[in-house]
UniProtKB/Swiss-Prot annotation:
Keywords: Cytoplasmic vesicle, Endoplasmic reticulum, ER-Golgi transport, Membrane, Protein transport, Repeat, Transport, WD repeat
Annotated membrane topology: Peripheral membrane protein
Family label: Belongs to the WD repeat SEC31 family.
Name of the protein: Protein transport protein sec31
Subcellular location: Cytoplasmic vesicle, COPII-coated vesicle membrane; Endoplasmic reticulum membrane
WD repeat windows: 5-46, 65-109, 117-157, 161-201, 204-247, 251-291, 294-334, 375-403
Gene that encodes it: sec31
Organism: Neurospora crassa (strain ATCC 24698 / 74-OR23-1A / CBS 708.71 / DSM 1257 / FGSC 987)
Residue ranges of the region described as Disordered: 473-507, 789-832, 870-1150
Biased composition (Pro residues): 980-989, 1030-1048, 1097-1143
Bias kind Low complexity: ranges: 800-817, 1049-1060, 1067-1096
Pfam families: TPR_Sec16, WD40
Length: 1256
């Protein structure tokens, strides 16, 4: 819980009926204020829960003086005449006063009427919840009146005068004419207003009835509470069988004064009483959920807020009305100082103060619990639950169902169809279907291109699709060539002619040797004829030749083709140059071609085309060709481009076309060039346009369906394109800078949609196409991988559920938390009698950390025994048990030395003693326990002073509660006989240490840690969990080891904090391990442990064994030698002369290197002592005491080594510099590494660090 506000009044109160939480208070009759004021007031209070500036204590918003004090007060529902309702007061003088709440807030005269019909004080009153104008009042001498608040002049009376007062009444919330009353006579009367007679009387065994509450859901059930201290119980009655109560709720120590049954959740009940406690219950099951912070005086009135039951208010005679939340599940703060400081002298003198409480409901309240819920599960699953109707008092349960779900069935079918087509490899049919269903020319052209690319000779088909056909004859040139022209030309027979339209004319170089095939045949025949002779002789160097021709002839004669070609090029005799070059090398031909094309630059375009083809440089065409002829350019690229350059050339041409604004033709170029990264950007834009067009059609599809279908078309297009082009993504190993990032995002989106429709394999397929380190896909990959794991690989065994099938599971909300195990050794025994002050204590069981967010928090258990815990009998036969489960046999084991178990229970050993007992095995270290907040965490937590809590009452597991349970040790009180007297300790053993006095009163064991933090107390160690070994839970009783009460003994201090337990208790200082006998039969407590809780003690031993102490050391320091070990047969070394010891408090012999640390610690201790609050004086005094122990060790130069002194000097320096973190770190290191040197003084050092940090 969290205390939100406090009202500093001892008053009766009532909640306002509206949503805004207001409280009205009236000075309580019979109470005396701290200032002994006799002033009586009616006041209104606004909680201001939404104001962060409002402090804990409130101030009234309206206040008027009343003529008499109040026994009870009620606030009725608003109506037309009274918009804020009517406030009714049950006055001590017997009058019924009514006030208008609206006028009271406005500061006007608010009194409506004052009527006196009662002859004595009015003890109780209540408005009828079903008829708000009806009011019932009850009081002294059995007077019971029913009023109409609109006309208070004529009330009618129920019943007749009686000897006993009526102290409480309650209207039935379901039946308007039923009223129940109760009083000091011990009877509960149920009245029927229709007959104006008592219809039923319940016998409460003549125990005074102080409170009545009707079941908010069942009109025949009610609760009654008794104010009798001898029977402080709550009884649940069913009027259908009124002979005996249906259930009894026990938990209060003294009489109960008030009940409040939550109207929104019949499983919640508040009760408060004379034991200063406010408890919360489940009245249907009788389970007690927890306890609110205990007050310092009687709590006489408690109520849930009628509008917001998470709020409740409790009034007590300590002068406060506490407004608090139902519970607090924030992680508990460090336990208060009393849980940390283990010195019994400190605890015996600690100031009495209330304890804090914290609890968590094991289930969510009804106003938070959802009766039905649904959630989409990954993989196309729909998970939903609904509440299963159960009878009152039974555990609430829900029916959980899992079914398949599809947002749009067409999406799933389209995906399946496409995947099947891909697996069949029928790409052509897919393309044909898309071509037929294409809605735009652009989409149709894209699918046609992909269909073409899927064929074997794709580039040839592309040329034909562009309208060109290879090897078609070309028309002869019509132009007349001049006979004198050095370069006669003709049409190139290998040129291309468009299929449709006017044919283009292309020129070609014509040989000077004439046209036709006759010359070629002739020359070939001559070349092939050996020794051919003609009648036409010629001169190599003719007289008619020019000088240039003779030079060419001479060069040819000598085989100098290069020189002959140079002469021809100089004279621009291109035909001769080409002819001669053909006789030479390939390089020579290329040289002539280059010179010719260079000379003819600017001539017809075919020469530039042939220049690019000859030079194998088609980039000039791709970058510079006119875009009006982009088809011819593409055909040229398809005809001449090298396969390695073809994609890039297509990309360059496509980029130019795209820049001109023609997306369709650019897409064509990208498709031809297999440039997926380019075409994807265009398709993404096309996807958005397609979606928008589909939405504008208003076909009735949802936005998601339209998007999913458009994305499906996009994915199919990309998939087919990758298939036909055999695209290989080379960027999957990159970590950033992906060119296909836009495509990856669509793949991821498509995988999510496929997974949402239950197609996990399809989703996995497309996730595998993404780069390995693609951050946006991490979550999707993990989800798909987990969802596709086989059942055998999971930790929990589950049944696989086919798609479309519904799995139903019924689960209980109050199931045991995960990780909890029942004790497996022995069953928990029955609670020992609370009247036996010498019964051995039994700690509460501790379970493992619970996963249930509504489970109650686990109490931190310290594996230790109380310093005042008496040892059990050395050996004794087991007692006769009242109950033993079938098959159980008490264990027998050899004699072991007496020890105290790790859970504070004296060990019990059965069987006859044997000579020696072996050492125990070390137990496992405690498990770290950390609880997080759950369903109703609140952002603001107001710290309260440390308060103690009360453990829950353990269940009865035996039909004979008065007898100890199985494996429980026999009671061994200080006055009992029967156990053999232990022998005295051997000579030479270390004497027992001094034992402090027991606490002044029986401390109440605390089962729940406080959430308040003591600024002067060091933070406690983390709470750990130890195995229970079948140890039973502890009852709520007085300390079992206190001496019997006497007439002169002071009363027990019920508010004193309980002494902290220790983690490790050594055996008695005896070589035999047996404690010495008590003198004259007087009770002697067990010696305290040498190692305190914060001294890094070893783990506790197992139950039934003694912890093996360390080896023997001199008496001034450590523990005694190991119990039960045989003596060492060695010659003792010569004893050194004993070093003189100085008296306590002497500081004159402290070594020089330790004086500075002593000065620093002393100064800081004085500073803390001067500024610490008076309530923490015991802690300060105890810390000073422990530091003096350290100084005495340093003064005597004993126990503490030089290295440890150096570390303490560093700690002191850090403390002087206010570096508390460093000081704490050094302290922890010393505690861990120098355990044998750390005694009681280390607790003082640790505490000083915490106090110094908290003191300004």
């Amino acid at each position: 819980m969290v205390r939100l506000r406090e009202i500093p009044r001892t008053a009766a109160f009532a909640w306002s009926p509206g949503a805004n939480p207001l409280l009205v208070t009236g000075t309580r009759s019979g109470a005396v204020d701290a200032d002994f004021s006799d002033e009586t007031k009616l006041e209104l209070w606004d909680l201001k829960l939404d104001s962060q500036e409002q402090g804990l204590e409130l101030q009234p918003i309206a206040s008027i003086t009343a003529e008499s004090r109040f026994y009870d007060i009620a606030w009725g529902q608003p109506n037309d005449e009274h918009p804020r309702g009517v406030i009714a007061g049950a006055m001590e003088n017997g009058s019924l006063d009514l006030w208008d709440a609206e006028k009271l807030i406005a500061g006007e005269d608010a009194l409506i009427s004052r009527t006196t019909k009662h002859t004595g004080p009015i003890k109780a009153l209540q408005f009828n919840p079903l008829r708000p104008q009806v009011l019932a009042t009850a009081g002294a001498k059995g007077e019971l009146f029913v009023w109409d608040v609109n006309d208070t002049s004529a009330p009618f009376r129920l019943g007749t005068a009686a000897a006993h007062d009526i102290d409480c009444l309650a209207w039935n919330p379901k039946v308007a004419n039923i009223l129940a009353t109760g009083g000091a006579g011990g009877f509960v009367t149920v009245w029927d207003l229709k007959t104006k007679k008592a219809s039923l009387t319940l016998n409460n065994h003549r125990k005074a009835v102080s409170a009545i509450a009707w079941d908010p859901e069942n009109s025949t059930k009610l609760l009654t509470a008794s104010s009798d201290d001898t029977a402080p119980v709550i009884l649940l009655w069913n009027l259908r069988n009124s002979q005996a109560p249906e259930k009894t709720l026990q938990g209060h120590d003294q009489g109960i004064l008030s009940l409040s049954w939550c109207q929104q959740d019949a499983g919640l009940l508040l009760s408060c009483g004379k034991d200063n406690r406010t408890l919360i219950w489940n009245p249907q099951t009788g389970e007690r959920y927890g306890e609110f912070p205990e007050a310092t005086n009687w709590t006489f009135y408690t109520r849930f807020n009628p509008h917001n039951p998470n709020l409740s208010a409790t009034a007590s005679f300590d002068g406060k009305i506490a407004i608090q939340t139902l519970q607090n599940t924030n992680p508990s703060a460090a336990p208060a100082a009393q849980n940390n400081l283990s010195d019994d002298d400190f605890f015996s003198k600690a100031a009495s103060q209330p304890q804090a409480a914290s609890f968590s409901l094991p289930r969510a309240p009804a106003w938070i619990e959802r009766p039905v819920g649904v959630s989409f599960g990954f993989g196309g699953k729909l998970v939903f639950f609904n509440k299963v109707e159960t009878a009152a008092g039974q555990k609430r349960s829900s029916k959980l169902q899992i079914s398949s779900f599809s947002i749009d069935s067409d999406i799933g079918s389209a995906t399946d169809k496409f995947e099947q087509a891909i697996q069949s490899g029928d790409i052509a049919s897919i393309c044909e279907e898309h071509i037929e269903n294409a809605k735009t020319d652009e989409e149709k052209a894209e699918w046609q291109v992909m269909q073409t690319l899927s064929e074997s000779d794709g580039r040839t088909k592309i040329i034909e699709r562009l309208g060109f056909i290879k090897d078609e004859p070309v028309e002869e040139a019509k132009e007349a060539e001049s006979p004198m022209s050095p370069e006669p030309k003709q049409e190139d027979s290998a040129s291309l002619k468009p299929n449709g339209g006017e044919a283009k004319k292309h020129r070609r170089v014509v040989s000077m040797w004439g046209d036709g095939d006759d010359g070629e045949d002739f020359l070939s025949e001559i070349a092939a004829t050996k020794g051919a002779k003609t009648d036409n002789p010629f001169n190599l160097l003719s007289v008619g030749n020019t000088h240039l021709e003779d030079q060419i002839t001479r060069a040819l004669i000598l085989g100098k083709f290069e020189k002959a070609v140079e002469i021809c090029l100089k004279e621009e005799r291109w035909s001769d140059a080409f002819l001669i070059a053909n006789c030479g090398s390939k390089e020579l031909v290329e040289k002539v071609q280059t010179a010719y094309l260079q000379q003819k630059r600017g001539s017809p375009s075919y020469l530039r085309l042939i220049s690019s083809v000859v030079a194998k440089n088609l980039w000039d065409i791709a970058y510079n060709a006119d875009l009006a002829d982009w088809k011819e350019t593409m055909v040229t690229l398809c005809t001449y481009a090298d396969p390695s350059e073809f994609p890039d050339l297509c990309e360059a041409l496509g980029d130019r076309i795209l820049e001109s604004g023609n997306r369709k033709d650019a897409s064509f170029c990208y498709l031809i060039g297999s440039k997926l990264e380019k075409v994807v950007g265009l398709w993404v834009d096309e996807l958005q346009e397609t979606e928008q067009a589909a939405l504008n059609e208003e076909a009735g599809d949802s936005t998601f369906s339209v998007h999913a279908k458009s994305l499906q078309q996009f994915i199919e297009k990309v998939t087919i394109f990758r298939h036909v082009t055999k695209f290989n993504d080379s960027e999957t190993s990159l970590t950033e800078g992906w060119k296909l990032a836009a495509l990856y995002d669509k793949y991821l989106e498509y995988a999510d949609i496929a997974a949402a429709h239950g197609q996990l394999s399809v989703a996995q397929k497309y996730l595998d196409l993404l780069p390995t380190s693609y951050p946006p896909a991490e979550t999707a990959r993990n989800r798909v991988r987990l969802a596709t794991q086989k059942a055998g690989a999971q930790t929990a065994v589950r049944q696989a559920t086919p798609a479309g099938r519904t799995t139903t599971t019924t689960s209980s909300r109050t199931a045991a938390p995960v990780g909890y195990q029942q004790p497996s050794l022995v069953p928990a025994p029955a609670n020992p009698s609370s009247l036996n002050p010498y019964a051995p204590p039994v700690p509460a069981p501790v379970s493992a950390a619970a996963s249930n967010p509504y489970a109650p928090p686990l109490a931190p258990v310290s594996a230790a025994a109380s310093q005042y815990g008496a040892s059990s009998s050395t050996y004794a036969p087991p007692q006769n048990q009242g109950y033993a489960p079938s098959g159980y046999t008490p264990p027998t084991q050899s004699y072991a030395p007496t020890s105290v178990t790790g859970y504070g229970v004296p060990a019990q050993n059965f069987g006859q003693p044997s000579p020696l007992g072996g050492p125990p095995k070390a137990t496992a270290p405690p498990v770290q326990l950390k609880r997080d907040g759950v369903w109703n965490d609140v952002p603001m937590v107001t710290k309260a002073p440390p308060r103690r809590n009360t453990p829950s009452v353990a269940p009865l597991t035996s039909p004979f509660p008065g007898q100890p349970g199985i494996a429980s040790p026999p009671p061994a009180g200080p006055f009992q006989q029967g156990a053999p007297t232990p022998p005295p300790p051997p000579k030479g053993s270390a004497p027992p240490r001094n034992v402090g006095a027991p606490p002044t009163g029986p401390p109440r064991p605390s089962s729940v840690s406080s959430n308040a933090t003591n600024p002067y107390a060091p933070p406690p160690p983390a709470a750990g969990l130890q195995p229970t070994y079948g140890v039973p839970p502890a009852p709520r009783t007085a300390s079992p080891y206190n001496p019997p009460p006497s007439a002169a003994a002071p009363p027990a201090n019920r508010y004193a904090p309980a002494p902290a337990t220790q983690q490790y208790t050594q055996g008695p200082p005896s070589g035999s391990g047996i404690a010495p006998p008590p003198a004259s039969g007087a009770y002697t407590p067990a010696p305290p442990a040498a190692s305190q809780q914060y001294a890094a003690a070893p783990p506790p031993p197992r139950a039934g064994f003694s912890a093996p102490p360390p080896a023997s050391r001199p008496p001034g320091g450590g523990p005694p030698p190991a119990a039960g070990a045989p003596p060492q047969q060695q010659a003792p070394p010569p004893a050194a002369p004993p070093k003189p010891r100085y008296p306590p408090g002497d500081r004159s012999n402290i070594p020089e290197h330790a004086k500075e640390l002593v000065d620093i610690l002393s100064r800081d201790m004085q500073r803390v002592a001067s500024k610490a609050p008076a309530s923490f004086a015991p802690q300060v005094k105890d810390t000073q005491k422990r530091l003096n122990i350290l100084f005495d060790h340093l003064n005597n130069e004993e126990l503490i080594k030089t290295e440890t002194i150096d570390q303490l000097a560093q700690l002191a320096g850090a403390l002087a510099g206010k570096n508390y973190d460093i000081a704490s770190k050094i302290q922890v290191e010393i505690s861990k590494e120098k355990t044998e040197e750390c005694g009681q003084w280390m607790v003082g050092v640790k505490r000083l660090i915490s106090m110094s940090k908290a003191t300004p």
